[in-house]
Amino acid sequence: MIQSINHVTYSVSDISKSINFYKDILKAKILVESDKTAYFILGGLWLALNEEKDIPRNEIRYSYTHMAFTIEESEFEEWYQWLNDNNVNILEGRTRDVRDKKSIYFTDPDGHKFELHTGTLQDRLDYYKEEKPHMKFYEWDEVDKTDNNRE
C-alpha cells in the first residue's frame, strides 16, 4: 500500500545556486549538503537536489508540471513581494475565479515550476462542481484521503 509521498528529487545545474535559492528564498531547512547533493525539509516534504550539469533543460518551460505548497491567504501579498524583491522568476498565472483562491507561480534557477496556493482540494472541488458540469465527480471521504480503508 502506498502511504504517502516519500520525497521529491530535482536535477539542478548548479548545486550552490540551488541551495541558496531553496534555503534563502523558500526558507527550506537544509539537512545535508555535498558538492553534488542537498537534502531539505520544505513544507514537511523531503526535497532532494542532485547536480547534473550536462542535461538539456529547455523543454521544462513548456510544461505545466509543478509542485504546489499551501500558504495562508493573509500571507499572499507578502510572499509575492518577497519573491519579487529577490528577483525570482514569477510566472504569469492563469485567470482564476475567486472561488479557486489565489496562486503565485514561479521557477527555481533551473526552471522547475512551483506554486504557492491559498486554496484546498475541497475548495477546488466545490468550485468545479458549480462551474464545470462536464466533469465527472466521485464520492470520497476522510478515510479515503489516507487510504486507511485499504488492505
Curated annotation (Swiss-Prot):
SUPFAM superfamilies for the chain: Glyoxalase/Bleomycin resistance protein/Dihydroxybiphenyl dioxygenase
Keyword Nuclease: no
Cofactor: Mg(2+)
Record function comment: Metallothiol transferase which confers resistance to fosfomycin by catalyzing the addition of a thiol cofactor to fosfomycin. L-cysteine is probably the physiological thiol donor.
Active site positions, chain numbering: 115
Record carries keyword Acetylation: no
Protein known as: Metallothiol transferase FosB
Signal sequence range: none
Lineage: Bacteria, Bacillati, Bacillota, Bacilli, Bacillales
Subunit structure: Homodimer.
Subcellular location: Cytoplasm
Location of the VOC domain: 4-119
Keywords, sorted A to Z: Antibiotic resistance, Cytoplasm, Magnesium, Metal-binding, Transferase
Enzyme's top EC category: transferase
GO molecular function, one term: magnesium ion binding
EC number(s) given by UniProt: 2.5.1.-
CDD domains linked to this entry: FosB (cd08363)
InterPro entries, per the entry: Fosfomycin_Res_Enzymes (IPR051332), Glyas_Bleomycin-R_OHBP_Dase (IPR029068), Glyas_Fos-R_dOase_dom (IPR004360), Metallothiol_Trafse_FosB (IPR022858), VOC (IPR037523)
Principal location listed in the UniProt entry: cytoplasm
Superkingdom of source: Bacteria
Family: Belongs to the fosfomycin resistance protein family. FosB subfamily.
Gene3D superfamilies: 2,3-Dihydroxybiphenyl 1,2-Dioxygenase, domain 1
Species this protein is from: Staphylococcus saprophyticus subsp. saprophyticus (strain ATCC 15305 / DSM 20229 / NCIMB 8711 / NCTC 7292 / S-41)
Name of encoding gene: fosB
Any GO BP annotation: response to antibiotic
Residues at which Mg(2+) binds: 7, 66, 115
